[in-house]
């Protein structure tokens, strides 16, 4: 493998054995591709905005005299960029402008004669845009639209599995689900009649819908049944015989023909009998008259003389009717062929319960069911039925629905109309009847071929269409009402309903969620999440066990591990690493094609539907060098089952061992050794890890760390290769390689880094450069690390030296004992940034004012404010400190005559305002790192706002000037090259100013042209700079668009540094979570023979019952990695020769059986080897991919190479006594995470505060400054101790004895420490509740 200069800085040793056939594709593509499809113009009009416009336009007036046509649309440029939107609290969006054409037709002239055409571009609201990282900025906060897994449109055949009816009879049903429109259900009842429901309303006999489609009884029977023909000859009945129909029946008479008795009466007819009948060619047999009695006729039989119907279709024959038929001269009688086995008389039976007789009565019946209480007219009934399933405006199966529909009915073509046809309905009924007859299978609803993904673009398009439909109604009204000659398209369209629909979706839909921004992994996982909840999906309460369960089709598409614990388990899933959606929205996963038992590198993506037809081998199947299967029998999956197949039967093979799991689970090393429940917790807890101040890459990783860090977008990645020309904490400048430059550009890339920004979870986002001046970089190299990344690898926690042993009860029940060294070295110190806002409004009594002049506040409290009343940057504040001074006008109070007199003499007093300043919340302390002031247009800016503005202008000018200088330097370097190659001496050039160079002339015409081009570029650059500066100035100085009634907003940002402390929650990556019980002095920690103490002591009892053995293997491998690092460190300290160093590191990389990674250090320069060694001295990072990790033997070899015992256990000594522990202890390095459940955020203590209104008891919870509930069990505890007075105090004055509380306060003030308990308020509540039940209880007081 070829490594770039940056990648050579630290290479992770990979234990993976299987070759990597397919690289992990961009992890956020599901979001970005979907949204791109939405806003990109699709010439076919199948997707996105184009599809929405085409489906609604043209809009015609009711009279048909005019219409509004859609021509095209374009999206404008967003006003603010992403960062500005976040600061200002606005939505990152672009204006949508649509070109519309209004056509007015001549009224009197023939149809289609155009009178006037007007074309105009109309504004249709704002469309939120997706940022480069797949998020949306809505009102200043980053949100993610989660993809939804919903039932695909199409037709589904299902059964109630015998749960509906008490008899346990299985009732089958079919449901036609459109993409939009009414649902159509067919279902059997326990009596085997077929019913239909529209939109889950009350059921009607299914034949009603056939009658509404203009089928007569005869046609219905003809469509659904085979016929049996009887002929009457001389009072004898002859039946046409199709022997196959007799199979399985019991003969009710002797079956004979040509004098041969084939089946005797009472005998069961078998296949042998049928073969005999067929062989002898028996076409007719004589049957007794009783045999035909009770059979239903196929058509109406009419007396030809009188024209009356003797026997109507579907009537059962009796002897009388038979006689009548014979008299009327009907010699040939056709009846329905039915039996109890596989030809049920369902439709025939249904017709008997059908109250309707013709089309009109059927339409009226459907109208009554859909619109109960409204009088039906023929026209209304026909319209309603037409619009239900046969109108393109109201009903759409969509391409997916039609494809699923046709596949289900086994049709050849998969494309077709979006509305239903007669054939569609009849074929669905036929298939349902076949299933009831025992032919065919019901569908599996949870199969991923029946559930599809609806992503951002599709949901936004649907919402946009909803808005357009609302507008359509208004436009129709206007086209019919207005004076069309003066109207323009602009006057027709009101953009409000459209932007309201879009805004509502992005702002408050259940699937538009506040982005989880704890760390890069939580961001990526949130964007790859798939939810079955949301509009048009399931609800938590209704979702049963089956929907939540892992299904065989989840393999490689949806992760079986990562899902939340709790009520949403199984409803919210995560996309697997390689999964993607196909054009229909179904999930597909890649496989390698197998041909004649040889695995090729050809990759096919298969959806769950396609996968069912193939035999697929596992990724860990043994292959020979030529890619053929080594074993004769191979473990494969086929049709959801796993079994052994011969090598010739295999069609495909998995691409990778980590194909099954999601990104989160693929980061857990030795996942294959963990119990699934714990792996689930591990995957979920990684997302809660807080980014630490000093990041530390995991010693034991899986090789996915780099992909996650880069794809999450928190790092700065080189767009093009080149050399680092300049680097500081806030910007990196790359001089682009000439071969990657566009013609005629300066060839400079500038990367501005993000510094100390608050994330959604109040963690700190900051980027740090990880390249040095003059270094070569290649495209895709990481230039700067973001939060939780280390040299471009994901680093969520810290490598800690841990020991598994009990330690004085401090690790009872998953607690952890942590060494003080961890605190001293700031290993788990995190920075949290809080945003506090102060809003100044215009009240009825006058405007609120932000000022330092606050009534009744001492000097000390104002010491941190400037003259505008806003806190300084850099001030250290604690709970209760004023951040922004604000006063609110008070209502006029009634004044006494004396006060009035004083007022009159001394003028206005400041007592008519009250203090409403922004203060630091209780329990929070930190440093002010930023202040922003937003002022409404037209309101005068205060001094502080002007200062901030001036500072921003200076900064913007400085940044732009520096950028210009960088670009200029690049340009002039190229101009100089051209001039020198054109024959001008370098010394002469250096004497001239750079601007004069452009005036020089060259003899060579080509060179002169180049020079002129560069001169043009220089002018353009300067002009561009002026334009940018002016735009920046305008943005900074313009007023802000604030909510109605708001004059000013001041935002103060506090940075809080949190060190680790007892009560904080920590976890490993294997679901091994715990709380810190004690921070122990270093000298008391257990230490090894070299005197090195451990950092954390974990309880060994936490491992066996939880079955997450992965943590033990990680500990051993971590120890080995550290051992190798220690050896490299020792060699560096002793200044060993580079050759020795190279040899040792090479040995470490080569270790392992048949590993895929090949690192050849001979291709590295000495300097590169030394730099690699410098980065490896703290431990050699190791990758052990999921299901393809390091074997026990390899771990032992690595331990041996590091000079450590292969048992992974060492002798420890007690730090307090110095005595050796009795047994050897497992010690090693485990990657530990600090989770975002910090004791500082949870802990609080109530003094006095608010009380609940009804019970008068203190509220609960930190947010309400509540108390702790003293519950039933706690009362028992005090009763057991006999602490009567303490108990009385708890239940009265400390809780809800209102009078007792006030008395006690008075007593304490008077210095009298007595308490008089009274009546608890909850007793009165109890009395009232009992009274509400009609029992009067009165309290008699002595």
UniProtKB/Swiss-Prot annotation:
The gene is rpoB. InterPro entries: DNA-dir_RNA_pol_bsu_ext_1_sf, DNA-dir_RNA_pol_bsu_external_1, DNA-dir_RNA_pol_su2, DNA-dir_RNAP_su2_dom, DNA-dir_RNAP_su2_hyb_sf, RNA_pol_bsu_bac, RNA_pol_bsu_CS, RNA_pol_bsu_protrusion. It catalyses: RNA(n) + a ribonucleoside 5'-triphosphate = RNA(n+1) + diphosphate. DNA-dependent RNA polymerase catalyzes the transcription of DNA into RNA using the four ribonucleoside triphosphates as substrates. This is DNA-directed RNA polymerase subunit beta. The RNAP catalytic core consists of 2 alpha, 1 beta, 1 beta' and 1 omega subunit. When a sigma factor is associated with the core the holoenzyme is formed, which can initiate transcription. The keyword Signal does not apply. Keywords: DNA-directed RNA polymerase, Nucleotidyltransferase, Transcription, Transferase. One of its GO terms (biological process) is DNA-templated transcription. GO terms for cellular component: DNA-directed RNA polymerase complex. Coiled coil: none annotated. Its EC number is 2.7.7.6. It comes from the Bacteria. GO terms for molecular function: DNA binding; DNA-directed RNA polymerase activity; ribonucleoside binding. Belongs to the RNA polymerase beta chain family.
């Amino acid at each position: 493998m070829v490594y770039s200069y940056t990648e050579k800085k630290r290479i992770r040793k990979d234990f993976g054995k299987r070759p990597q056939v397919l690289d992990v594709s961009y992890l956020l593509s599901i979001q970005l591709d979907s949204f791109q499809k939405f806003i990109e113009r699709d010439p076919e009009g199948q997707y996105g905005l184009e599809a929405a416009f085409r489906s609604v336009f043209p809009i015609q007036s009711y009279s048909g005299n005019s219409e509004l046509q859609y021509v095209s649309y374009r999206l404008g440029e967003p006003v603010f960029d992403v960062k500005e939107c976040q600061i200002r609290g606005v939505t990152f969006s672009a204006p949508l402008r649509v070109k519309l054409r209004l056509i007015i037709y001549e009224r009197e002239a023939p149809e289609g004669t155009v009178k006037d055409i007007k074309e105009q571009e109309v504004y249709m609201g704002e469309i939120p845009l997706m940022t480069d990282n797949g998020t949306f900025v809505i009102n200043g906060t980053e949100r993610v639209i989660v993809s939804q897994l919903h039932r695909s449109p199409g037709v589904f055949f299902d059964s109630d599995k015998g749960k509906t009816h008490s008899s346990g009879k299985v009732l089958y049903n079919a449901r036609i689900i459109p993409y939009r429109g009414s649902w159509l259900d067919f279902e059997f009842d326990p009596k085997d009649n077929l019913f239909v429901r529209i939109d889950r309303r009350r059921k009607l006999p299914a034949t009603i819908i056939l009658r509404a489609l203009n089928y007569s009884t005869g046609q219905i029977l003809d469509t659904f049944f085979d016929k049996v023909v009887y002929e009457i000859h001389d009072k004898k009945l002859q039946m046409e015989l199709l022997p196959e129909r007799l199979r399985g029946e019991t003969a009710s008479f002797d079956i004979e023909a040509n004098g041969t008795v084939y089946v005797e009466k009472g005998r069961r007819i078998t296949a042998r009998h049928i073969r005999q009948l067929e062989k002898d060619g028996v076409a007719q047999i004589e049957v007794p008259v009783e045999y035909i009695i009770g059979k239903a006729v196929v058509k109406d039989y009419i007396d030809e003389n009188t024209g009356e119907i003797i026997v109507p279709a579907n009537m059962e024959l009796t002897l009388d009717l038979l006689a009548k038929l014979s008299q009327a001269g009907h010699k040939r009688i056709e009846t329905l062929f039915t039996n109890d086995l596989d030809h049920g008389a369902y439709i025939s039976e249904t017709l008997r319960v059908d109250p309707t007789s013709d089309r009109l009565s059927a339409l009226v019946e459907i109208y009554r069911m859909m619109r109960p209480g409204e009088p039906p007219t023929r026209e209304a009934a026909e319209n309603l039925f037409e619009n239900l399933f046969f109108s393109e405006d109201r009903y759409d199966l969509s391409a997916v629905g039609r494809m699923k529909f046709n596949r289900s009915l086994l049709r050849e073509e998969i494309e077709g109309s979006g509305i239903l046809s007669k054939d569609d309905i009849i074929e669905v009924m036929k298939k349902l009847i076949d299933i009831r007859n025992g032919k065919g299978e019901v569908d599996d609803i949870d199969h991923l071929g029946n559930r599809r993904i609806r992503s951002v673009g599709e949901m936004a398009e649907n919402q946009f269409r909803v808005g357009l439909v609302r507008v359509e109604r208004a436009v129709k009204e206007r086209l019919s009402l207005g004076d069309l000659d003066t109207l323009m398209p602009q006057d027709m369209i009101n953009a409000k309903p459209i932007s309201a629909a879009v805004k509502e979706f992005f702002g408050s839909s259940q699937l538009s969620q506040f982005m989880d921004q704890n760390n890069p992994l939580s961001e990526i996982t949130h964007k790859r999440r798939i939810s079955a909840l949301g509009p048009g999906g399931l609800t938590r309460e209704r979702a049963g066990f089956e929907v939540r369960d892992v299904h065989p089709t989840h393999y490689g598409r949806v992760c079986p591990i990562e899902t939340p614990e709790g009520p949403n388990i199984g409803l919210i899933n995560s996309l697997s690493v390689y999964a993607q959606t196909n054009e229909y929205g179904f999930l597909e996963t890649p496989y390698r094609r197998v041909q004649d038992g040889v695995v090729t590198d050809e990759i096919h993506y298969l959806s769950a539907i396609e996968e069912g037809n193939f035999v697929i081998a596992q990724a860990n199947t043994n292959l020979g060098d030529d890619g053929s299967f080594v074993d004769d029998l191979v473990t494969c999956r086929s049709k959801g089952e796993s079994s052994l197949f011969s090598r010739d039967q295999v069609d495909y093979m998995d691409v990778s061992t980590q194909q099954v799991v999601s990104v989160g689970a693929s980061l857990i090393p030795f996942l294959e050794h963990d119990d699934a429940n714990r792996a689930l917790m591990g995957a979920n807890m990684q997302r809660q890890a807080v980014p630490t101040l000093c990041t530390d890459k995991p010693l034991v990783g899986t090789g996915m760390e780099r992909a996650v860090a880069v794809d999450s977008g928190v790092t700065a990645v080189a767009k093009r290769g080149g050399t680092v020309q300049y680097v500081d904490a806030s910007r990196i400048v790359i001089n682009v390689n000439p071969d990657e430059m566009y013609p005629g550009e300066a060839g400079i890339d500038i990367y501005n880094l993000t510094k100390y920004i608050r994330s959604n979870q109040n963690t700190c986002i900051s980027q740090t450069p990880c390249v040095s001046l003059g270094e070569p970089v290649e495209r895709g190299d990481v230039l700067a690390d973001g939060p939780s990344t280390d040299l471009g690898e994901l680093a969520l926690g810290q490598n800690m030296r841990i020991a598994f042993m009990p330690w004085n009860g401090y690790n009872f029940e998953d607690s952890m004992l942590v060494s003080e060294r961890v605190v001293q070295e700031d290993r788990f110190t995190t920075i949290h940034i809080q945003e506090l806002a102060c809003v100044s409004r215009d009240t009825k009594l006058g405007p609120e004012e932000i000022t330092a002049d606050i009534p009744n506040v001492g000097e000390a409290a104002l010491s941190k404010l400037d003259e505008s009343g806003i806190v300084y940057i850099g001030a250290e504040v604690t709970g209760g400190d004023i951040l922004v001074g604000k006063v609110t006008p008070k209502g006029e109070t009634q004044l006494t005559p004396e006060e009035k007199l004083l007022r009159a003499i001394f003028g206005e007093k400041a007592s008519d305002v009250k203090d409403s300043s922004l203060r630091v919340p209780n329990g929070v302390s930190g440093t002010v790192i930023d202040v922003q002031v937003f002022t409404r247009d037209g309101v005068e800016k205060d001094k502080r706002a002007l200062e901030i503005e001036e500072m921003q202008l200076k900064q913007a000018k400085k940044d732009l000037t520096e950028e210009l200088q960088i670009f200029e330097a690049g340009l002039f370097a190229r101009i100089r090259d051209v001039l020198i190659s054109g024959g001008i001496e370098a010394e002469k050039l250096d004497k001239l100013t750079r601007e004069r160079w452009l005036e020089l002339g060259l003899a060579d015409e080509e060179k002169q042209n180049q020079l002129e081009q560069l001169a043009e570029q220089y002018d353009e650059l300067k002009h561009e700079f002026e334009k940018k500066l002016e735009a920046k100035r305008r943005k900074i100085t313009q007023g802000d668009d604030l909510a109605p009634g708001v004059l000013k907003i001041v935002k103060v940002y506090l940075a809080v540094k949190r060190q680790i402390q007892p009560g904080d929650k920590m976890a490993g990556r294997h679901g091994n979570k715990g709380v810190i019980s004690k921070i122990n002095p270093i000298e008391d920690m257990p230490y090894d023979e070299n005197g090195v103490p451990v950092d954390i002591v974990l309880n060994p009892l936490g491992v066996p019952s939880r079955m997450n053995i992965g943590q033990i293997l990680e500990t051993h491998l971590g120890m080995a990695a550290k051992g190798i690092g220690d050896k490299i460190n020792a060699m560096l300290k002793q200044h060993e020769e580079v050759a020795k160093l190279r040899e040792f590191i090479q040995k470490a990389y080569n270790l392992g059986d048949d590993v895929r990674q090949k690192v050849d250090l001979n291709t590295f320069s000495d300097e590169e080897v030394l730099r690699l060694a410098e980065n490896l001295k703290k431990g050699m990072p190791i990758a052990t991919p999921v299901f393809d990790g390091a074997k026990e033997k390899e771990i032992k070899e690595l331990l041996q190479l590091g000079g450590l015992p292969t048992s992974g256990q060492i002798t420890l000594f007690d730090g307090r006594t110095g005595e050796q522990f009795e047994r050897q202890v497992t010690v090693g390095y485990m990657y530990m995470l600090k989770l975002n459940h910090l004791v500082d955020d949870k802990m609080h203590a109530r003094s006095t505060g608010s009380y609940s209104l009804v019970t008068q008891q203190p509220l609960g919870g930190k947010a309400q400054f509540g108390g702790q509930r003293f519950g039933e069990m706690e009362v028992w505890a005090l009763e057991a101790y006999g602490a009567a007075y303490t108990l009385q105090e708890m239940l009265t004055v400390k809780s809800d004895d209102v009078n007792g509380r006030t008395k006690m306060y008075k007593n304490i003030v008077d210095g009298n420490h007595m308490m008089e308990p009274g009546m608890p308020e909850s007793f009165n509540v109890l009395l009232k509740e009992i009274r509400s039940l009609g029992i009067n209880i009165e309290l008699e007081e002595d």
